[in-house]
Amino acid sequence: MKFVDEVEIRVDAGDGGNGCISFRREKYIPKGGPDGGDGGDGGDVYLEADENLNTLIDYRFERFHKAERGKNGMGKNCTGRRGNDIVLPVPPGTRATDIDTGEVLGDLTKHGQRLMVAKGGFHGLGNTRFKSSINRAPRQKTDGTPGEVRPLKLELMLLADVGLLGMPNAGKSTFIRSVSAARPKVADYPFTTLIPNLGVVRPAPHQSFVIADIPGLIEGAAEGAGLGIQFLKHLERCRLLLHLVDLAPFDETDPAEQARIIINELEKYSPKLAEKPRWLVINKVDLLLDEEVQEKVDELVKSLNWDGPVFQIAALEGRGSDALCREVMSYLETLPAPDTEQHEEADPVEFMWDTYHEEVLEEEMDDEDDDDDDDHDVEVIYQK
């Protein structure tokens, strides 16, 4: 199945049903008074995280989604039925953004989590609502309000503990193959990896973490060079980044310069992402003599002014990979669980009709005297 991690859709909540003007008419009760019922509320639109999905491809072809309209009110104080909601399943890790305002409506990170993205219209009020001691036969009603319409941008951000960064052919896919059961394509040409890959690493029994491999970055990626930076968003939820550097590139470029390119592109994309914990992992040490390796590593660390952890591995042989994974696992265990991490409280999403019913009732009651004057000396006709 094709991997699609970004789509644009439109969601239409259902309109509210109209209120009814009706009067009670029964045998021996010629003037029974108003009995028009309210309409039904329009259906809402929800997104729901479904762990059985891993792509947004379905919404590439089906882009318009509309909830059901509320039914109109009827006589005998019968309220119209509420419109049915619609629930759109999305993969865990999906973020919903309002295209018009740029407002992030929410993130769906757990299976079964729901997010309302469009609120149905409020029901219209029947004429029963407007009766009073001085207005016994009101001919007032309100129509249901239209449901909200939102153009949405859905972005899938993979849920992983560790993310891999590096130039093309730095050995990221080889590394993830050596430490997990993931089998991304590996070849000796750039951009072999075209989509993100996930792997589960198990350094010890009952211990595991998820690692994400994304396509490599090149200079100018922020301006769209290569595959651009579209896949960097998949690292935003990672708690640790592993920056893989090829110590012996086949084109004999400077490893330090390649590392600086990645750091610069990361900072251009998101300063917040650039501040995440990042470890330097020097790969392909098996292509050099042992005495050359340490010398080149020291030069690289000095050139980058690197003061963080540094690891040397040969991903193809698996040398150093297990030790690195154990260190990663130990580090992750020192961090708070993702569910208990402190997050800034998001502002509540404002929906169009949250206070509509209070405003309508206040407005109608304020205008009640004017309506009574209009009804003076008017003959009331009762009918079924």
Swiss-Prot record:
Query: OBG-type G domain location, by residue?
Result: 160-333
Gene Ontology cellular component annotations, sorted alphabetically: cytoplasm
The record's keywords, sorted A to Z, are:
Cytoplasm, GTP-binding, Hydrolase, Magnesium, Metal-binding, Nucleotide-binding
Region Disordered, residue ranges: 72-94, 358-384
Protein origin, superkingdom: Bacteria
Positions with a binding annotation for Mg(2+): S173, T193
Where found?
A: Cytoplasm
Where in the sequence does UniProt note compositional bias of the Acidic residues kind? 360-377
Q: What is its main location?
A: cytoplasm
What Gene Ontology biological process does one annotation of this record name? ribosome biogenesis
Annotated Obg domain residues: 1-159
Ranges annotated as spanning the membrane: none
Q: Which cofactor does it need?
A: Mg(2+)
One GO MF term attached to the UniProt entry:
GTP binding
Q: Provide the residue positions that the database annotates as binding GTP.
A: 166-173, 191-195, 213-216, 283-286, 314-316
What is this enzyme's EC? Answer: 3.6.5.-
Summarize subunit and interaction data from the UniProt record for this chain.
Monomer.
NCBIfam families, sorted:
Obg_CgtA, PRK12297.1, PRK12299.1
| Protein family per UniProt | Belongs to the TRAFAC class OBG-HflX-like GTPase superfamily. OBG GTPase family.
Q: What does this protein do?
A: An essential GTPase which binds GTP, GDP and possibly (p)ppGpp with moderate affinity, with high nucleotide exchange rates and a fairly low GTP hydrolysis rate. Plays a role in control of the cell cycle, stress response, ribosome biogenesis and in those bacteria that undergo differentiation, in morphogenesis control.
Protein's UniProt name: GTPase Obg
- Origin organism of this chain? Idiomarina loihiensis (strain ATCC BAA-735 / DSM 15497 / L2-TR)
